[in-house]
Curated annotation (Swiss-Prot):
Keyword Lipoprotein carried by entry: yes
Name of this protein: Substance-P receptor
Major localisation: membrane
Source species of the chain: Aquarana catesbeiana (American bullfrog)
Single annotated GO MF: substance P receptor activity
């Protein structure tokens, strides 16, 4: 897979070499240049502004610095980078049909944007796995801030390794209509095994595998949060936390589905192009259309966050409070409350739930001891320190010492 417009120029190069000429077949008329200029400019502006605001909302507010949001910062940075370093260059390349930037940037242009695509999808995968551990296995250790940063570094390292062949084999070829940046694979045109193997490998690692992992994780999460009945304490606060947890999962499912839809035509196109080269007249317009769809994935996430998350919405309203038709509302929603207050409130709520559970357990044991002596089971939701629902887990009614340990 190639992340830039050099794919169309690969076909132009191969065709012109076979015909013994050096004429660029993909010169565009002015009206097409104008349309693509507007289309790609929208992506760049919305993506850069939106993702920078997302990073600011999370980094500048302590209340937003959670494991999931750290990965969202990484995702926003990857998408902003892809928009800045890839979309802008493709825009100018499509207008002038000439590579002005030399061999070094040709290699970087093929290498870094693909690294960003890898990082984007694996950041989503990390978020899905973190949500899975938090909700399905709440008693297991969670990622710390340091561990999260290490995972992010591992994701980028893996992304750089996977994108290395694109940077290594990128080359500049002089043509009469202008230089082109293309991938000069070591095998011949008749035997394109290197390219074909790489395309299939990338398709599996950047699309199929992570989406399978994400799909399985959110399936189990959905079964826990929606399919399971929530017994026990029916306080408003308790159910508000469950609803909040569901909203986060819904938001991330929308983000992943958007990414999958935007990038599917792009991956299919490159697989087909690898197996059968296309040099038809409509090739360039078709390529630019699916490239625009793929690149547009970088601008949707900030919009999704703003629509589906209250805190992100507050942050966006605060940034655009200068607009006459936007009411900023209460900016304090992003600020951190007193840590002592939050801990006290959480502890009191947890103690109340523990006392209710223990009382219910003892009463149940007294009633059933005369009949069969069997211990009953009940479903309870373990709560995190901030009051959010962690998971539905089974606890034996006769293990009252478990609750005592948690209380301590």
């Amino acid at each position: 897979m190639n992340s830039n417009i050099s794919a169309q120029n690969d076909s132009a190069l191969n065709s012109t070499i076979q015909n013994g000429t050096k004429i660029n077949q993909f010169i565009q008329p002015p009206w097409q240049i104008a349309l693509w200029s507007v289309a790609y400019s929208i992506i760049v502006i919305v993506s850069l502004v939106g993702n920078i605001i997302v990073m600011w909302i999370i980094i500048a507010h302590k209340r937003m610095r959670t494991v999931t949001n750290y990965f969202l910062v990484n995702l926003a940075f990857a998408e902003a980078s892809m928009s800045a370093f890839n979309t802008v260059i493709n825009f100018t390349y499509a207008i002038h049909n000439h590579w002005y930037y030399g061999l070094i940037y040709c290699k970087f242009h093929n290498f870094f944007p693909i690294s960003a695509v890898f990082t984007s999808i694996y950041s989503m995968t990390a978020i899905a796995l973190d949500r899975y551990m938090a909700i399905i296995h709440p008693l297991k250790p969670r990622l710390s801030a340091t561990a999260t940063k290490i995972v992010i570094c591992v994701i980028w390292s893996f992304s750089f390794c996977m994108a290395f062949p694109l940077g290594y084999y990128a080359d500049v070829y002089p043509m009469e209509g202008g230089d082109i940046c293309y991938l000069n694979w070591p095998d011949s045109e008749e035997n394109r095994k290197y390219e074909q193997v790489y395309q299939v490998l990338v398709f599996c690692l950047i699309y199929i595998l992570p989406l399978l992992v994400i799909g399985c994780a959110y399936t189990f999460i959905g079964m826990t949060l929606w399919a399971s009945e929530i017994p026990g304490d029916s306080s408003d606060r308790y159910h508000e936390q469950v609803v909040a947890k569901r909203k986060v999962v819904k938001m991330m499912i929308v983000v992943v589905c958007t990414f999958a839809i935007c990038w599917l035509p792009f991956h299919i196109f490159f697989l087909l192009q690898t197996l059968h080269e296309m040099t038809q007249k409509f090739y360039q317009q078709f390529y630019l259309a699916i490239m625009w769809l793929a690149m547009s994935s970088t601008m949707y996430n900030p919009i999704i966050y703003c629509c589906l998350n209250d805190r992100f919405r507050i942050g966006f309203k605060h940034v655009f409070r200068w607009c006459p038709f936007i009411r900023a509302g209460e900016y304090e929603g992003l600020e951190l409350k007193s840590t002592r207050y939050l801990q006290t409130q959480s502890s009191m709520y947890k103690i109340s739930r523990i006392e209710t559970t223990v009382s219910s357990v003892l009463n149940t044991n007294d009633e059933e001891a005369e009949e069969n002596g069997k211990s009953s089971k009940r479903l309870s939701l373990d709560l995190t320190s901030n009051g959010s629902s962690r998971s539905v887990c089974k606890t034996m009614s006769d293990s009252s010492s478990f609750y005592s340990n948690n209380l301590a």
